[in-house]
Design a protein with these regions (language model features):
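Charge-dense, helix-prone N-terminal extensions
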Residues: 1-112
Length: 112
């Protein structure tokens, strides 16, 4: 999956917004809470939040590491898009979205 495919997938999720942070990172957010971050410059790099179980499983795969500064919150960083299939990318980014959604106020959740 490339940056454009990630962007297309994320923007189809309800109430997703995008913005550029830290100069060159494209952030996908739900109610101002990030759930996926991709680098706009340099080599491919994408990070997303995952469950404790998925974090342990994914970080055992070569090419997937705990995300710098965000690992304590169970974010992973991927530098080679081919380590996951397109279906896996969509599954894990979708799960990241759901994890963020579950932490938002119930009123917001019900509005979706």
């Amino acid at each position: 999956m490339n940056l454009e495919s990630i962007q297309t997938f994320c923007l189809q999720l309800p109430q997703t917004t995008e913005g550029i942070k830290w100069g060159n990172d494209l952030c996908f957010m739900l109610s101002e809470k990030m759930y996926c971050v991709a680098s706009l410059t340099g080599p491919f790099s994408c990070s997303f939040k995952c469950s404790d179980e998925d974090f342990a499983k994914l970080t055992e795969i070569p090419g997937i590491i705990p995300a710098p500064y965000m690992a304590r919150n169970k974010w992973v960083n991927i530098h080679e898009s081919s380590v996951l299939t397109d279906e896996e990318w969509e599954h894990y980014i979708g799960n990241s979205y759901q994890l963020i959604l579950s932490k938002l106020p119930k009123k917001f959740q019900q509005s979706l």
